């Protein structure tokens, strides 16, 4: 048939694009999506937030996936020179955040990068732009009481942390607080857990992840 002739002439790599179209100008299609639920959960941590202190936050398998993590405390998203924020222009070194999986460090950020590079540049939506905290300014919709840790798994739904596939590995975030940091109150750490249906959970447990 003409379709087979076209397939042979174009190549097998084009099967995915032309073989099973999902959109037609002449009929209506309904796309099916998998079911999931989300719930923010408070996370326990080991250590005390304060100047030069180290804090470990174990990521428990309360859900199937983890999308993003943030810290709540009065004035924790400080700008310029301050005492209550994880960043200060007067600090000798910034606060460091590192992600550890199975005893190996897989990602590391610091508050200078977060507020000096990430927040000013990666504002791809109006909502993010109105909440941004940089080294010198805090936008109008940011109260300064929340500090998002922008690890890779919180930026894109396709890169969420598959906790269900890491059940035999210790997963934790380690924080090395900057010098001069004096929290106003006891910080609280939260994580956004995602819960999958049975079929999709099986996909995450049975397949390799890169």
Model regions and ranges:
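Short, low-complexity Pro/Thr/Gly
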Residues: 1-210
């Amino acid at each position: 048939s003409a379709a087979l002739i076209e397939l042979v002439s174009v190549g097998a790599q084009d099967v995915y694009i032309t073989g099973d179209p999902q959109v037609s100008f002449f009929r209506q299609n309904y796309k099916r999506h998998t079911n999931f639920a989300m719930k923010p959960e408070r996370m326990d941590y080991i250590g005390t937030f304060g100047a030069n202190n180290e804090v470990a936050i174990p990521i428990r398998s309360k859900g199937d996936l983890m999308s993003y993590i943030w810290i709540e405390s009065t004035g924790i998203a400080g700008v310029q020179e301050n005492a209550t924020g994880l960043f200060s222009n007067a600090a000798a070194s910034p606060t460091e955040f590192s992600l550890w999986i199975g005893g190996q460090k897989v990602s590391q950020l610091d508050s200078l990068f977060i507020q000096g590079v990430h927040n000013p540049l990666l504002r791809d939506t109006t909502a993010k732009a109105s909440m941004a905290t940089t080294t010198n300014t805090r936008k109008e919709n940011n109260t300064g009481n929340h500090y998002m840790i922008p690890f890779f798994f919180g930026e894109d739904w396709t890169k969420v942390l598959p906790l269900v596939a890491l059940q035999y590995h210790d997963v934790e975030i380690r924080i090395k607080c900057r010098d001069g940091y004096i929290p106003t109150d006891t910080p609280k750490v939260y994580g956004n857990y995602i819960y999958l249906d049975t079929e999709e959970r099986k996909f995450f447990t049975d397949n390799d992840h890169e």
